Amino acid sequence: MSRVAKAPVVIPAGVEVKLNGQVISIKGKNGELTRTVHDAVIVKQEANALNFRPREGFRNAWAQAGTTRALLNAMVVGVTEGFTKKLQLVGVGYRAAVKGNVVNLALGFSHPIEHQLPAGITAECPSQTEIVLKGVDKQVIGQAAADLRAYRRPEPYKGKGVRYADEVVRTKEAKKK
């Protein structure tokens, strides 16, 4: 039994929720998100909250209900507050710049990298070694940050590379003679 699914998702003022079978749309001041819910989950809107119940006949219904609750809660937070992800570039000559929807990276390769951001995500560079991604959809933000990090992951000897702002890179000791 999922303890997560038992807690309702509170719908704040200014957020509109539409239930159409298994398709749920959540609209707020930052935008609108839509998601199709798994068949094993029953979603009911009561007053200003969404409640979740498992449907009979599905083996993993409680697990799906907990997952659905977490996903819909992230959607509500996204359309009200939004999500941010911060990246740092550590290394000599590693730089970033943003032009429109394209992030230009200089990461020590023989060529510059131009990364096209997905729709609905904005990026800004407070400094040449920092990138801040903002958006409504938590999954898309995380994937965009992971794609940028994948160009040059932090290496374990000096820690150079693209890392999340809150990431702690464990460094190894150099080989001794």
Swiss-Prot record:
Gene3D superfamilies: Ribosomal protein L6, alpha-beta domain (3.90.930.12)
Keywords for this protein: Ribonucleoprotein, Ribosomal protein, RNA-binding, rRNA-binding
One cellular component (GO) term of this entry: cytosolic large ribosomal subunit
HAMAP family: Ribosomal_uL6_B (MF_01365_B)
Homology family: Belongs to the universal ribosomal protein uL6 family.
Subunit structure: Part of the 50S ribosomal subunit.
Protein known as: Large ribosomal subunit protein uL6
Species: Buchnera aphidicola subsp. Acyrthosiphon kondoi (Acyrthosiphon kondoi symbiotic bacterium)
Species classification: Bacteria, Pseudomonadati, Pseudomonadota, Gammaproteobacteria, Enterobacterales
Gene that encodes the chain: rplF
